[in-house]
């Protein structure tokens, strides 16, 4: 903040002095400074917030001779503005009034109401419903590092659900492990942040990185910090953690304590993830396969969007977690597949389960908001609604013979706190307000004193009307009214002409106490009216006070049952994911994959899950299924390599991606888009498909390609699956060919992994003669009348052409350019055959085709059209042999007429 230091030699108001003092302690955050019904921002904070939020920038007072910039947002709409600021990378310190203004006045007329920061709002510490995506986890991640050996670990927490995990990592895996979790915020020690070895990773992550003092990550003090946070005397029940893991856990907890100030979100005990338990997918592969987001950052078009049939927020998050971290143990994958199989076999029951699941709110997030003091009556209502749905699901499953995973989930649901569920049902009204301060959320009959206070508060109009009638009868003034305003409270009002009955005698004056004289009226009160007003006011305050006490009581009970509530919610998510994957499998015709520890990779009639659905939505031609068999050719052998050649637009990239996606789906525990699938678990998946540059880091498309290819060749092992597309195309032809050639040889001899390698270098097909595990396959095409028809079928063999000119024609290049390209191609091919290619280049007339008259397109005759229409109307898959023979005779007859 410029020009706002506390030592500035200028007289400021006490309020502004207070602001500057608080801001000095929160220099890295925008300060939301509470003033009445607004959060105000000043100085540079105001300028930044005004631009980010599109709100008016005004001014308040002067500092160093210049106006102080100011802007503000209403308290009731603060969440909407916080959402925009967080999305733009800002952190916000929320400063509230922590004493009543009346208390401040007791210290003197110029005393300022005490204020303090009650919370730091950062991307990784959100709990508000408006600020969170229901289908996406909101992780805060901390990186721990030990001195000396530099060992690394990551701990990640979603305070909106209580999820807490930790795992060791290494410098070469660090970026991949971070991107797998995809945290909203990464907290690192400031010493690590400036480390030359790690800094490139932090630069890639950008604004999400938050450096913090190294003392927060002290592994020696971690045990005490963990014990204090979880309120335990020993960590014996937490399992064993390494020093870097303790450092990461300490950093994560310390940052939560720092941002939540006095609140303590209820977290699960940290769960350790073991190395190798999940499929390693490097960041480039994760991006190119568009698992959770497309290359443009959108959810639509991603694999997650294509397979998501969940109906709850928790289920959507669990599905995303499984997709981004597929398992590598067949023993762990099988129970998930068993769950989907059971759901498919019990479709009627599963439909009933999904109807119940649709009524399940986000219980873990409601619980977290309640625990940190940001919850409301509707969060308690969410728990009650969730308990009701869970009870319905438990009833539906009563007596059902379930597979292991679903049986464990049912057990967790049955252990939910039934007593607390009944308590909520008795206590909460049917219609709940958003804010607890609005009252009205406690059911009538739950608390007798509350009912009494409400009656007095709500029946005040009837009581006042009765008193007004008594005063009219007593004074004889028929126009007498009892009214109310915020200044006088309740008062009696009569016209000036009628005031004599209330002022002419001493008895009347003592009875009716004069309060105010207006131009045409006079206002009075009575002891009786004042006492009634006090009772009414106190009744409203007392009713709200009782309700708030009940709210706190219910909240405390909810937090006390946090573990069982979260366990039940997690179980409901398991049922949601299992039934959703069953719906997907039934809807799309997926099969159960056979997953084991072998090196097999045999996909029969595989399809691309995203492209297939897109074609169906567009009512286009159906997706062409293809086989892929990378299994060892003999027992004990290594996986195979397929060298794929074929034209542009032939479907090579789609084929490559679909096999990688099938492996991911199988290992996450889903059925797969294929006729059958036998997959030996993949431990590392690498994909280099599609071209992109990295201009910000000074890297060309070719350089990016080489860096990613190097990572693959250096890390792939026999259980890996490698997908490579067009390696070497970004440089001179012979350079590219030699790099691609050497890469395939290395994959075959050194990595010995299963691989799909697509290329336009047809010379590489000769490798099949020297590499025993390499097979040539190609994308089939048909040529007809100078046109090429892409069949999108994979077949054994090799392509001898790329059909680039035909693709250029389909893309809409001017006919003159296409004709010129065809002439150049023919002469280059002839020159290559005769060894005179360079001389022929010089002999080509310079774009002479531009001078040629473009040939008119042939007119289609009616008879030709009749024949074409007849062919187009054929559905080959639906014809019997007899019908096909009859059709051949008919077409021959039409052809004869033509």
From Swiss-Prot:
Any one GO molecular-function label of the UniProt entry: mismatched DNA binding
GO aspect biological process, one term: mismatch repair
GO cellular component: a single term: cytosol
Binding positions for ATP per the UniProt entry: 646-653
Keyword Endoplasmic reticulum: no
Pfam families in the record: MutS_I, MutS_II, MutS_III, MutS_IV, MutS_V
Keywords: ATP-binding, DNA damage, DNA repair, DNA-binding, Nucleotide-binding
Function: This protein is involved in the repair of mismatches in DNA. It is possible that it carries out the mismatch recognition step. This protein has a weak ATPase activity.
Family according to the record: Belongs to the DNA mismatch repair MutS family.
Name under which the protein is recorded: DNA mismatch repair protein MutS
Record organism: Brucella ovis (strain ATCC 25840 / 63/290 / NCTC 10512)
Taxonomic classification: Bacteria, Pseudomonadati, Pseudomonadota, Alphaproteobacteria, Hyphomicrobiales
Gene: mutS
